[in-house]
Curated annotation (Swiss-Prot):
<feature type="topological domain" description="Extracellular">
    <location>
        <begin position="648"/>
        <end position="812"/>
    </location>
</feature>
<dbReference type="InterPro" id="IPR049873">
    <property type="entry name" value="NMDA1-like_N"/>
</dbReference>
<feature type="glycosylation site" description="N-linked (GlcNAc...) asparagine">
    <location>
        <position position="239"/>
    </location>
</feature>
<dbReference type="GO" id="GO:0045944">
    <property type="term" value="P:positive regulation of transcription by RNA polymerase II"/>
</dbReference>
<dbReference type="GO" id="GO:0043197">
    <property type="term" value="C:dendritic spine"/>
</dbReference>
<feature type="glycosylation site" description="N-linked (GlcNAc...) asparagine">
    <location>
        <position position="674"/>
    </location>
</feature>
<comment type="function">
    <text>Component of N-methyl-D-aspartate (NMDA) receptors (NMDARs) that function as heterotetrameric, ligand-gated cation channels with high calcium permeability and voltage-dependent block by Mg(2+). NMDARs participate in synaptic plasticity for learning and memory formation by contributing to the long-term potentiation (LTP). Channel activation requires binding of the neurotransmitter L-glutamate to the GluN2 subunit, glycine or D-serine binding to the GluN1 subunit, plus membrane depolarization to eliminate channel inhibition by Mg(2+).</text>
</comment>
<dbReference type="InterPro" id="IPR001828">
    <property type="entry name" value="ANF_lig-bd_rcpt"/>
</dbReference>
<dbReference type="GO" id="GO:0005783">
    <property type="term" value="C:endoplasmic reticulum"/>
</dbReference>
<dbReference type="GO" id="GO:0070588">
    <property type="term" value="P:calcium ion transmembrane transport"/>
</dbReference>
<dbReference type="GO" id="GO:0019233">
    <property type="term" value="P:sensory perception of pain"/>
</dbReference>
<dbReference type="GO" id="GO:0098839">
    <property type="term" value="C:postsynaptic density membrane"/>
</dbReference>
<protein>
    <recommendedName>
        <fullName>Glutamate receptor ionotropic, NMDA 1</fullName>
    </recommendedName>
</protein>
<dbReference type="GO" id="GO:0021586">
    <property type="term" value="P:pons maturation"/>
</dbReference>
<feature type="modified residue" description="Phosphoserine">
    <location>
        <position position="890"/>
    </location>
</feature>
<dbReference type="GO" id="GO:1903539">
    <property type="term" value="P:protein localization to postsynaptic membrane"/>
</dbReference>
<dbReference type="GO" id="GO:0050905">
    <property type="term" value="P:neuromuscular process"/>
</dbReference>
Length: 938
C-alpha cells in the first residue's frame, strides 16, 4: 500500500514539473495610450502577437493606462500600474493637445531611471533623440528634423542649389538646421543664408526683407504652427509668395493654424501613418515581441523591477534589452519596415509630398525612405506656375575678389581727391581703372588697414567686359590675407579650411574670383571654374648675367699665350728677313758700284715689313729683295691672313654676341633635383605651385627644400632674385615672362611644365558659371583676349633690345681706343727722344766740321809759310782766331760737363770712347795753333 502511494506521488510530481517546463514565460508589456479605445487596440495587438509567435515559448501580457494631464500623476501611474507589474517595455503615445498636456516626458523620465525601454508611438519632437535626457527612449516614427532628408532629396531632384533656411531658434529648428547642413556638407554645398527667429515672435518682416535681397528663391521653413503662420503673413505682404519663389515646409507648417495662412503653391510633407496610433501600436508590439524572444535566448537575464523603490531597483538587463530593441529589424510592420538608428529614431519613413492648391492639400509625390518620386504634372507652384522655378534670381550686384599680381592686376593708391590718375596704354588708349578696397600694401610703413585703391590690368579689363556683356554691376576688393587659396588645418585638428580668395568665395564674402587663379583639381572640387581666359604653365625665373666689357676685351679672342707667340713671331720673322736679305748674294741687286747701301733691307725696314704684313697696313718701302727672303715673306703673309681672319671672327663673337650662360635647363636640372644650400629656389606659400610640388611624389625632395625658402608673394620673390638672395623662382609662366620683359636683369629659362590655365572662380551653385564661360569663349573667338594679351602681357621693353641687330658700344671698344691713346703717348715720348738725339748729333757734326775747317786753315797757312809767302791776310787771320776760340770754348764746356758728371757713368765712358780719336787730333791741332799764334805775336 505504501508502495502504491509512493508511485502515485512520483507520477504527480513529474507531471507538475513537465507542465512547469512546458508553460510559456509571461512577459508583461506596458502602455500609456490616449484613449480607452487605443487600450483595447493594444490588447488586441498583444493577442495577435501571441498567436503569431506561439512557438516562441513566451506569452505577452498587456498592461495599460491612459494619459494623465498632470506630469506627477503620470509618473505615479507608471510606477504603480506598470513598473509594479514588472513590464519589459512601455509603449507611449503623444496625442495632440493645445498645450501639449499629454507629453511622454514623465513616462520617459520614470522608466528611463529604472532602465526600462520606452517606445514612443507618435512622438515627433527632436528633443527625444537626446539620449543624455531620454536615456531609454525609442520611437516608431522619425523626428521632425528627419524631414531635412526629404528637403535635401527634393533639392537634388529639382537641381536647386540656392536655398535660404528659415528656422525658429529652438531645439526643433536647430536640429533641422544641423541635419540639413550636414547633408549639404556631404554634397560640398551650403545654404546661401540661415535666418533664425525667436519662437513666438510677431514680426519677421526685417528677416524676410533680408532674404528677399539674396539670390536664392527656395525657402525652407522649420517652425511651429503659430510661427509658420506669422511668417506666411509677412511673406505675403512682401510679395514673396508669388512667381519664382519655392516654399518647402514640413508637417507642422501645413497643419492647424498655419494652413490658414499658407500660400498656394507651397510644398509640404506628411508622414504616412504618422498619426495612425493603432498602426504604430501594432508595430511596436511586434518589435517588442521579437526583441524579447532574442533577449531570452541570452544568459544571465534578470527580471524587471517590481515597483519604484529607490535606485537599488534598477533593471540590470535593461540596457541590454534596449540594445536588442535598437538592433531589431521588423519587416512586417503595418507602417512599413521598422528599424532604429543610433538615436533610437525610426530609420526609414515614408512621406506624402503635399501641394496646397486652392486652399486644399493635394498629394503630388511620395518619399519612399530613400528617394523622392514627384508627379510634376500635378504640381502648381507659387504664382500659379506649372513650370518648375529655377530657384534663384540673377543678382545684378556682384562682390568681386582679386589679388595684386602684375600684369593681371595692378594696384596703385588713389589721388588726394579719391580718384585714379589717368594713364594710357602702349596703344594710346586710356587705362580702365576701378576702385578696389583692400589692405594698403602700396604704402610701406603705414598701418595695415583697408583703404580705397586703384586697380587696373588684364583682369580688370576682362571684368569690365563681362559686366557689360552680362549686365551686372560689381564692387571689387583685394583679398585680405594676400593669398590665392589653399587648405590649412584649423587649430592643429583634422578639419581643413580654405584661406585666401578661395576661402572668401566659399564663405560668401565674394561672389566671383577675377584674378590669375590657376585651375587645378584640388580647387575644382570645391568651386566652379570658367573656361580658361589665359593658357600658361610653370617656368623658372633667374637673374641674367650681364657681360661686362673690360679694357682688354679686344684681346679676349686669343689667349695670352697665343698673343705672346704672335708677337714673338713678328720679331723673329723680321730678324730672319733681315739676315736672309743681308747675306744673300742677290740681296742688294746692285746694278753698278755706285748704288748706295741705304737702299738695301735694313733691320728697321724688316720690322716695318713684318708688322705691316700682319696688320695689313701696306708696304711702302723696305721690301726684301732676295728670293729666299721673299719666300719667307709670302709664308708670313699667309700666316698673317689666317691669324687676322680668326681674330676677326672671334672678336665678333666676343664683342657683339652674348656669351652662352650656364642657366637652369628646366625642372629636371641637377641643381633643382639635387638641392643644396648653395643654390636656393622657391615659390609662393600656399599657392597652386606649392600644392603641385606637395602633391607630386617625385618632386618631394624639391618641395622640402622649397618649403624652407618660400615667399609670401610673387613680388617679394622676384625682388629677391634681383637682389641675389634667391637663385631661381618657380611661378606662372605668364607672370614671369612679363617680369623678364620689363626687368632686363631677369630671364626665364627652361621649358614650360605643369601646363594649365587661369580661370574665373565661382561657387558650385553660382547661376553665372555658364554665362561667364560662354562670354570668355566668345572673347577668344572675336580677338578680345588677344588684344588684352598684347596690351598687358606681351608689352615688352627688353626684348626690343635683344632682338635688334647687335651693335658695338664704346664700352666694347674702349680698350682699342686706349691702345690708340697709348700709341699717341708713346709717339710723343719718342719724338722728344728723337729731337734730343738729333740735336746732340747735329752738335757733334758741327764740332767736327769746325775742327776740320780749322785744320784746313792751319794747313794752308803752314803751306803758305813754307813756301815763303807773305803774312796771311788779316781777314783770314781773324777767321782763324774765331774758329780756334770757338773750338776752345766748346772743348772747355765739354770738359766742365764731364767733370760735373757723377763719377763718369757708363754713358760718359762710352761717349769718351766714341770721341777719343778725333778729340786727341783736335787737341794736337789746338796745341799747334796756340804755338803758331804766340810765334806770330812775337
Amino acid at each position: 500500500m505504501s508502495t502504491m502511494h509512493l508511485l502515485t506521488f512520483a507520477l504527480l510530481f513529474s507531471c507538475s514539473f513537465a507542465r512547469a517546463a512546458c508553460d510559456p514565460k509571461i512577459v508583461n508589456i506596458g502602455a500609456v495610450l490616449s484613449t480607452r479605445k487605443h487600450e483595447q487596440m493594444f490588447r488586441e495587438a498583444v493577442n495577435q502577437a501571441n498567436k503569431r509567435h506561439g512557438s516562441w515559448k513566451i506569452q505577452l501580457n498587456a498592461t495599460s493606462v491612459t494619459h494623465k494631464p498632470n506630469a506627477i500623476q503620470m509618473a505615479l501611474s507608471v510606477c504603480e500600474d506598470l513598473i509594479s507589474s514588472q513590464v519589459y517595455a512601455i509603449l507611449v503615445s503623444h496625442p495632440p493637445t493645445p498645450n501639449d498636456h499629454f507629453t511622454p516626458t514623465p513616462v520617459s523620465y520614470t522608466a528611463g531611471f529604472y532602465r526600462i525601454p520606452v517606445l514612443g508611438l507618435t512622438t515627433r519632437m527632436s528633443i527625444y533623440s537626446d539620449k543624455s535626457i531620454h536615456l531609454s527612449f525609442l520611437r516608431t516614427v522619425p523626428p521632425y528634423s528627419h524631414q531635412s532628408s526629404v528637403w535635401f532629396e527634393m533639392m537634388r531632384v529639382y537641381n536647386w542649389n540656392h536655398i535660404i533656411l528659415l528656422v525658429s531658434d529652438d531645439h526643433e529648428g536647430r536640429a533641422a538646421q544641423k541635419r540639413l547642413e550636414t547633408l549639404l556638407e556631404e554634397r560640398e554645398s551650403k545654404a546661401e543664408k540661415v535666418l533664425q527667429f525667436d519662437p513666438g515672435t510677431k514680426n519677421v518682416t526685417a528677416l524676410l526683407m533680408e532674404a528677399r535681397d539674396l539670390e536664392a528663391r527656395v525657402i525652407i521653413l522649420s517652425a511651429s504652427e503659430d510661427d509658420a503662420a506669422t511668417v506666411y503673413r509677412a511673406a505675403a505682404m512682401l510679395n514673396m509668395t508669388g512667381s519664382g519663389y519655392v516654399w518647402l515646409v514640413g508637417e507642422r507648417e501645413i497643419s492647424g493654424n498655419a494652413l490658414r495662412y499658407a500660400p498656394d503653391g507651397i510644398i509640404g510633407l506628411q508622414l504616412i501613418n504618422g498619426k495612425n496610433e493603432s498602426a504604430h501600436i501594432s508595430d511596436a508590439v511586434g518589435v517588442v515581441a521579437q526583441a524579447v524572444h532574442e533577449l531570452l535566448e541570452k544568459e544571465n537575464i534578470t527580471d524587471p523591477p517590481r515597483g519604484c523603490v529607490g535606485n537599488t531597483n534598477i533593471w540590470k538587463t535593461g540596457p541590454l534589452f534596449k540594445r536588442v530593441l535598437m538592433s531589431s529589424k521588423y519587416a512586417d510592420g503595418v507602417t512599413g519596415r521598422v528599424e532604429f538608428n543610433e538615436d533610437g529614431d525610426r530609420k526609414f519613413a515614408n512621406y506624402s509630398i503635399m501641394n496646397l492648391q486652392n486652399r486644399k492639400l493635394v498629394q503630388v509625390g511620395i518619399y519612399n525612405g530613400t528617394h523622392v518620386i514627384p508627379n510634376d504634372r500635378k504640381i502648381i507652384w507659387p504664382g500659379g506656375e506649372t513650370e518648375k522655378p529655377r530657384g534663384y534670381q540673377m543678382s545684378t550686384r556682384l562682390k568681386i575678389v582679386t589679388i595684386h599680381q602684375e600684369p593681371f592686376v595692378y594696384v596703385k593708391p588713389t589721388m588726394s581727391d579719391g580718384t585714379c590718375k589717368e594713364e594710357f596704354t602702349v596703344n594710346g588708349d586710356p587705362v580702365k581703372k576701378v576702385i578696389c578696397t583692400g589692405p594698403n600694401d602700396t604704402s610701406p610703413g603705414s598701418p595695415r588697414h583697408t583703404v580705397p585703391q586703384c586697380c587696373y590690368g588684364f583682369c580688370v579689363d576682362l571684368l569690365i567686359k563681362l559686366a557689360r556683356t552680362m549686365n551686372f554691376t560689381y564692387e571689387v576688393h583685394l583679398v585680405a590675407d594676400g593669398k590665392f587659396g589653399t587648405q590649412e588645418r584649423v587649430n592643429n585638428s583634422n578639419k581643413k579650411e580654405w584661406n585666401g580668395m578661395m576661402g572668401e568665395l566659399l564663405s560668401g564674402q565674394a561672389d566671383m574670383i577675377v584674378a590669375p587663379l590657376t585651375i587645378n583639381n584640388e580647387r575644382a572640387q570645391y568651386i566652379e571654374f570658367s573656361k580658361p581666359f589665359k593658357y600658361q604653365g610653370l617656368t623658372i625665373l633667374v637673374k641674367k648675367e650681364i657681360p661686362r666689357s673690360t679694357l682688354d676685351s679686344f684681346m679676349q679672342p686669343f689667349q695670352s699665350t697665343l698673343w705672346l707667340l704672335v708677337g714673338l713671331s713678328v720679331h723673329v720673322v723680321a730678324v730672319m728677313l733681315y739676315l736672309l736679305d743681308r747675306f744673300s748674294p742677290f740681296g742688294r741687286f746692285k746694278v753698278n758700284s755706285e748704288e748706295e747701301e741705304e737702299d738695301a733691307l735694313t733691320l728697321s725696314s724688316a720690322m716695318w715689313f713684318s708688322w705691316g704684313v700682319l696688320l695689313n697696313s701696306g708696304i711702302g718701302e723696305g721690301a726684301p729683295r732676295s728670293f729666299s727672303a721673299r719666300i719667307l715673306g709670302m709664308v708670313w703673309a699667309g700666316f698673317a691672313m689666317i691669324i687676322v681672319a680668326s681674330y676677326t671672327a672671334n672678336l665678333a663673337a666676343f664683342l657683339v654676341l652674348d656669351r652662352p650662360e650656364e642657366r637652369i635647363t628646366g625642372i629636371n636640372d641637377p641643381r633643382l633635383r639635387n638641392p643644396s644650400d648653395k643654390f636656393i629656389y622657391a615659390t609662393v606659400k600656399q599657392s597652386s605651385v606649392d600644392i603641385y610640388f606637395r602633391r607630386q611624389v617625385e618632386l618631394s625632395t624639391m618641395y622640402r627644400h622649397m618649403e624652407k625658402h618660400n615667399y609670401e608673394s610673387a613680388a617679394e620673390a622676384i625682388q629677391a632674385v634681383r637682389d641675389n638672395k634667391l637663385h631661381a623662382f618657380i611661378w606662372d609662366s605668364a607672370v614671369l615672362e612679363f617680369e623678364a620683359s620689363q626687368k632686363c636683369d631677369l630671364v626665364t629659362t627652361g621649358e614650360l611644365f605643369f601646363r594649365s590655365g587661369f580661370g574665373i572662380g565661382m561657387r558650385k551653385d553660382s547661376p553665372w558659371k555658364q554665362n561667364v564661360s560662354l562670354s570668355i569663349l566668345k572673347s577668344h573667338e572675336n580677338g578680345f583676349m588677344e588684344d588684352l594679351d598684347k596690351t598687358w602681357v606681351r608689352y615688352q621693353e627688353c626684348d626690343s633690345r635683344s632682338n635688334a641687330p647687335a651693335t658695338l658700344t664704346f664700352e666694347n671698344m674702349a680698350g682699342v681706343f686706349m691702345l690708340v691713346a697709348g700709341g699717341i703717348v708713346a709717339g710723343i715720348f719718342l719724338i722728344f727722344i728723337e729731337i734730343a738725339y738729333k740735336r746732340h748729333k747735329d752738335a757733334r757734326r758741327k764740332q767736327m766740321q769746325l775742327a776740320f775747317a780749322a785744320v784746313n786753315v792751319w794747313r794752308k797757312n803752314l803751306q803758305d809759310r813754307k813756301s815763303g809767302r807773305a803774312e796771311p791776310d788779316p781777314k783770314k787771320k781773324a777767321t782763324f782766331r774765331a774758329i780756334t776760340s770757338t773750338l776752345a770754348s766748346s772743348f772747355k764746356r765739354r770738359r766742365s760737363s764731364k767733370d760735373t758728371s757723377t763719377g763718369g757713368g757708363r754713358g760718359a765712358l762710352q761717349n769718351q770712347k766714341d770721341t777719343v780719336l778725333p778729340r786727341r787730333a783736335i787737341e794736337r791741332e789746338e796745341g799747334q795753333l796756340q804755338l803758331c799764334s804766340r810765334h806770330r805775336e812775337s
